[in-house]
Amino acid sequence: MCKLSVSEAKQMLAEAARLNPGPWVRHSEYVAAAAGRIAARCGLDAEKAYTLGLLHDIGRRFGTGHIAHVYDGYHYLIKLGYADAARIALTHSFNNGSLDDYIGNYDISAEKQQKLSALLAAAECDDYDRLIQLCDAIATADGIVAIEERMNDVKRRYGFYPQRKWDKNIELKRYFED
């Protein structure tokens, strides 16, 4: 497993932005900034949290996919030897560890969905996974917002927001506030 520096993560995000520009890049930067700040206050490695935040959506470098960005990001980072970042790319959209709560299109094959589900089941989440899940739930492309505002925005755009996922986000917020 390779250690990922902030500089390397920024270069990877910049390359991804050239391949597939969009608001997801600024969102990733805000996730990273929030993760770094919260990590520093909670006794976690702020630099590690920042790099993981930068790369949580790195699968978007391959296009504008929905769940495909999770699958693609995980495999891309694994190939590069960044297991921790790959795990975060995998877990960031699934705060309950299940595909059932995914908000968006299932734009991968049934076979890839099964692989993704198995990877999620095997993932051993830690505070960095939880932190990026929280920061993903408070960061937009325009900055950090109240968690309820962000979840309502997603609900407006997709037409629903699973209650179980909503409740877990509130739980994560409380976890890092304590």
Regions found by a protein language model. Give the residues of each.
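Divalent metal-dependent catalytic cores for phosphoryl transfer on phosphate-bearing substrates
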Residues: 14-17, 41-154
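Non-catalytic interface/linker regions that flank or bridge core catalytic/transmembrane domains
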Residues: 1-2, 161
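Charged phosphate-binding loop/patch that engages nucleotide di/tri-phosphates or the phosphate backbone
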Residues: 157-178
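Generic N-terminal amphipathic, Lys/Arg-enriched alpha-helix
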Residues: 6-21
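Amphipathic alpha-helices of TPR/Sel1-like and other helical repeat/solenoid scaffolds
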Residues: 31-35
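Acidic-glycine-rich active-site phosphate/pyrophosphate-binding loop
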Residues: 2-9, 48
